[in-house]
Each structure stands twice: as structure tokens, then as C-alpha cells.
Amino acid sequence: MATLIYVDKENEEPGILVATKDGLKLGSGPSIKALDGRSQVSISCFGKTFDAPTSLPKATRKALGTVNRATEKSVKTNGPLKQKQPSFSAKKMTEKTVKAKNSVPASDDGYPEIEKLFPFNPLGFESFDLPEEHQIAHLPLSEVPLMILDEERELEKLFQLGPPSPLKMPSPPWKSNLLQSPLSILLTLDVELPPVCSDIDI
């Protein structure tokens, strides 16, 4: 870490040298440069370098001091004006809110027909039963394969069959021919491959 320290002659101690601990450990001595009647001490070290802010001459300090004082005075003069403005705008805001309250229609009178459009019964969403005409509780559905039915007539035929038995099982009305016998499916998947050449040495 390198630090730059300026020593003013006004402080009556121009010979002060400040070194960091790293600089003392490394054995690097500080170097002094003279700039405009001031002595500058710079210490070089390894790692990140940070520069201390340079001190300004008295003339610039006075100039900045007067600028700062001028801005403080302007802030003080603007302060009371800002306090008066909110009170003026508060009157306008109260007038606007009164006008808005008069212009907004009452919520009770507006749109009563919308509430009647959608009747809502929360108990209706808790029942998971099918209607009586579509009850399937009397059918033994264990181990029944998925069937895709074409029309309502086939559905009626299925209900007229009664409980299924392994001895009297009619052919189900399948919609597609995807569930064919395994041999027919394997025959469609057969692909002719080129003959194997046994003459080629591997």
C-alpha cells in the first residue's frame, strides 16, 4: 500500500516522514519530492495502491469555504418556502378529494345484476359423486383394461353385459387396432438387413 503524505510548512514540521508497517518491513525508504513549496512523502509498497487525497492550498480552501457558505444560506432561505407550499397544496388536495367523493357512484347501487349471474355454493365443490344416471359403483372395475368407445350405443352395450367373467368375455369394441397380437406387431417391425459378409477379416 502506497500512501502520499503532504507536509505543510505552516505546520512548522517540514521534516516529518510517516511510513507504513509494510514499508518498514520491506526496508524500502520513503522518497521526498518538493511540489510548490511543499514536501511530498511517497512510500512504495507491493499490493494495492491507494492515494491519499491531496491537500489544497489556502486560497482554494477559502474559495470552497465561501461556496459552501453560500449554498448553506441558499438552503436556509429555501427552507421556509418549501414549508409554505405543502399547506397550499393540502387545501387543493382536500378540494379534489371532496369532488372525487361526490363524482364516484355508491358501491351498493352499482351493478346488482352481476351478483345474480354466477350462483356460488361452496358445498357443491366438495362432493365428488357422479350423477345418478352415470353411477359406476355397481360395476366391478378391477383389472378392467382401458377401452375407447365410439358411440353411446357401445357404452349401453357395455352396461348391459353385466359383471365380467373370465369364461364369457366378449371381444371389447376397440376403436383402434393398436392392441393387436404380439406376433402381428413383430411382423410389421421386421426390416430386411443386408447379408453378412464372412469373407472380410476383422
Swiss-Prot record:
Q: Which keywords does this chain's UniProt record carry?
A: Cytoplasm, Nucleus, Proto-oncogene, SH3-binding
Q: Which Gene Ontology MF annotations are present?
A: SH3 domain binding
User: Where is the motif (SH3-binding)?
Assistant: 163-173
User: Superkingdom of the source?
Assistant: Eukaryota
Q: Where is this motif: D-box?
A: 61-64
Task: Kindly indicate whether the keyword Cytoplasm belongs to this entry.
Answer: yes
Per UniProt, what is one Pfam family of this protein?
Securin
Provide the residue span(s) of the region labelled Disordered.
Answer: 69-106
Subcellular location, principal: cytoplasm
Which residues are connected by disulfide bridges in this protein? Answer: none
Q: Which GO terms describe its cellular component?
A: cytoplasm; nucleus
List GO BP terms, alphabetically.
Answer: chromosome organization; homologous chromosome segregation
The record's section on InterPro entries has:
Securin_separation_inhibitor (IPR006940)
The record's tissue-specificity note reads:
Expressed in ovarian tumor and tumor cell lines (SK-OV-3 and PA1).
Q: Where in the cell is it found?
A: Cytoplasm; Nucleus
Comment field on protein domains: The N-terminal destruction box (D-box) acts as a recognition signal for degradation via the ubiquitin-proteasome pathway.
To which protein family does this belong?
Answer: Belongs to the securin family.
UniProt cross-references to PANTHER family, sorted A to Z: PITUITARY TUMOR-TRANSFORMING GENE 3 PROTEIN-RELATED (PTHR10418:SF3), SECURIN-3 (PTHR10418)
Mind telling me what this protein is named? Putative pituitary tumor-transforming gene 3 protein
Organism of origin = Homo sapiens (Human)
Phylogenetic classification of the source organism:
Eukaryota, Metazoa, Chordata, Craniata, Vertebrata
